[in-house]
Each structure stands twice: as C-alpha cells, then as structure tokens.
Design a protein with these regions (language model features):
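WD40-repeat beta-propeller superdomains and closely related acidic/aromatic-rich repeat-like regions
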Residues: 1-365
Length: 365
C-alpha cells in the first residue's frame, strides 16, 4: 500500500491552515459529549446524539445561526443517529438497546427493543424490493439487524458478525461494518434482503478500528484507528486498486531541554474519531481526532492540503451538510486519556464551519 505525499504528516502546524474566524458556536443545552452528527438529506436540519441520553435536532439558517427544534429523550447514552431518505424520520440508539424514532412532521416518538446489548451504530439504507425506511443496526451483541420501521416486531434479516460492532456506515449499496479484533465485513445491500451477500476482511491498520466511512459512490471505504492512522480501501478489491494507509493524528513531542541531538524522538499518537467525505467533491474527505485536529485530504491526489487550528479539546464527531457548504464538528471529552483526565471544565461545543471552495475543490496537478 502507498501513503500520502506529505513531508511532515504528523505536524499539522506546517499544513495550509483553514480559517475558523467565521465558525459559529451552536447555543445548545447538550450536557455531555456528542457521539454522532448527521444532517438531513433534504433540509438544513442537524441531528446530534449525545452521551447525555438525548438526540438534539437543530434548524440551521443560512447565516449559521441554529435553533433547537426537537429532542429524542432515550434516558441513557445515545451513540448514534441518522435520518431517513426523505428527512421525515430521525432515529437514535445506544446503551439502552432500543431504537428511538421521531417523526419530523408530528413530533411523535416511538421506540422498540432491537438488540441484546448496546447499539453502536445505525443507518437508514436502500434495499431492493423493500420499503423506503429500512434501518440497519449494529450492536455489541455481535449482530447486525435490518428493520422495517412500519413493522418493528421482528427484524427483516440478521447478520452474525465475528465480533462486537464498533462502527458502521452505508452508501450506494455498500454496508461497511467494523468490529472488535479488526474485522471488516462488507455487505452488498443490492442483494436479496433475506440473503445478504457479505465478505470479511481484515482492517489494513495494525491496531483497533475506531471508525469506518463508505465512499459516497459505494466503491470503497475509509477506516481510522486508535493509532493515529487511517486507510483507504476499494470495493470490490482488485490487484491494481488504489488502496493505501497513512499517518494522520500524530504529533512529534519537543525534545527535552538540553537533550542530545540523537535522542530518540517521542511521538504522541491520537485516535481517529471520525471520517467524512464531501458530498459534491467526493474525493475530498476529513479526519477528526482526539488531538483536537481536523484535516482535509484528497484521496486521489494522496495529499493533505488543509488543517483546522488545533481545537481546545477532542473532536468527537463531524459531518458535512447535504450540499457540502457547512461542516459541523463537536468538541468534547472522548475518554482517550482515561477517567483521570476528565473534568467538569473540559470544553463541550457544537460548531458550524462555513466551507470555503479552496478547502474542498481538488487541486490540479
């Protein structure tokens, strides 16, 4: 596998800096770290699931002012959320083993028990000859289940995974599931819902998978790990594909004062918490990490060309709006440094960044 063309991939301060002067903080009553951010596919509504036991929904105006317009109260930490294809339903799930559904039109909320252990991820997906609103849920009970929201009495199908589901994403017929022990399961959603075709491969990275994100066209996926590395994999795999791995959220620590020139260098390694592809310029993607950094990359050029100024806390979640003009990101404690480093004064923010053309347009040459 190849790597990104960057002389100093672990030194974001030497990359071209994205301006955050116009970033807007969302006034919010979120009281704990945001776990997932998802934009409506049809409007400027943003859903934010949180460890505070709620999914908060915001209406974002053109000037990036935002107001709360709805809440799902799950009563226990919510790890994931998503919108259905026409933006009429918001779903959330997490520690309570239930899926919660909120109708955007009526404000009515319903729920159903979906798994025997916490639900780590859910996505609305398209499958052949099936109703519009199919939810796929991935759980620590080592299963992925498919649900028709009109009839949640039993799943349409169940896929047994090799280990606990840690991350999951879907786009254009491809479902990517990352589990414990670095297994990646790839599911062809265009197959018969009762006979989903899937294959299992190993994560190209050496340490535990933290996040997977499908390409917008379903022809591959990105993966990030706890070791400050990420990778790009094509689907289906071929002998001449463009898969590669690269370092990202790593920082060389300054040498102790008076240290010899040949002293062994120390590198701080941070988890990759989230990866997002731009919906218009689909070769462009972002990585967000425990180090408080956000990077913009071009997977075709193998180049990193923008980085945000390092934020004051970990970036726990991020997402592009449906037109790619707004990039939402959350700052909050992600437990990467353990219990001892948590504090009531740790930053807790939801930010909206207006995306400049030069940040996302692929560069020629």
């Amino acid at each position: 596998m190849s790597s990104f063309k960057s002389k100093t991939p672990s030194l974001p301060s030497q990359a071209v800096g994205a301006s955050v002067d116009r970033d807007q903080a969302v006034t919010s009553n979120v009281t704990d770290t945001i776990s997932t951010l998802r934009w409506s596919p049809v409007a400027s509504y943003l859903a934010a699931s949180s460890w505070d036991g709620k999914v908060h929904i915001y209406d974002v105006a053109n000037d990036l002012t935002a107001k709360g317009v709805g809440v799902i109260d799950a009563g226990s930490p919510v790890f994931t959320c998503d919108w259905n294809q026409d933006g009429t339903i918001v779903a959330g799930a997490g520690a309570g083993k239930k899926v919660y559904l909120l109708s955007a039109a009526t404000g009515q909320a319903t729920s159903f028990i979906a798994h025997d252990a916490p639900i780590r991820s859910l996505r609305f997906v398209k499958v052949p000859n099936a109703p519009l609103d199919i939810i796929v849920t991935g759980s620590w009970d080592k299963t992925v289940r498919y649900w028709d929201v009109r009839n949640t009495g039993s799943p349409l199908a169940t896929l047994t995974c090799k280990e606990r589901v840690y991350s999951m994403d879907a786009a254009d017929g491809l479902l990517v599931i990352a589990t414990a022990d670095r297994h990646i399961q790839l599911v062809d959603l265009k197959a018969d819902p009762n006979n989903f075709k899937n294959s299992t491969t190993n994560d190209p990275l050496k340490h535990q998978t933290h996040v997977v994100t499908a390409f917008p066209d379903g022809k591959g996926y990105a993966v990030g790990s706890i070791e400050g590395r990420a990778g790009i994999k094509m689907f289906p795999e071929t002998s001449s594909d463009n898969s590669f791995t690269f370092r990202c959220h790593r920082h060389e620590a300054p040498a102790p004062k008076g240290a010899a020139k040949d002293v062994t260098k120390t590198v701080d390694v941070w988890a990759v918490n989230d990866i997002n592809f731009h919906p218009v310029h689909t070769s462009i993607f972002t990585t967000a990490g425990s180090d408080g950094c956000i990077y913009f990359w071009d997977r075709l050029a193998h180049a990193r060309f923008y980085t945000f100024p390092r934020r004051e806390g970990a970036i726990s979640a991020s997402a592009f709006s449906r037109d790619g003009r707004v990039f939402a990101y959350a700052v909050g404690y992600d437990w990467a440094m353990g219990y001892a480093k948590n504090s009531p004064t740790y930053p807790l923010k939801l930010m909206l960044h207006p995306v400049a053309d030069e940040e996302v347009k692929p560069r020629k040459g």
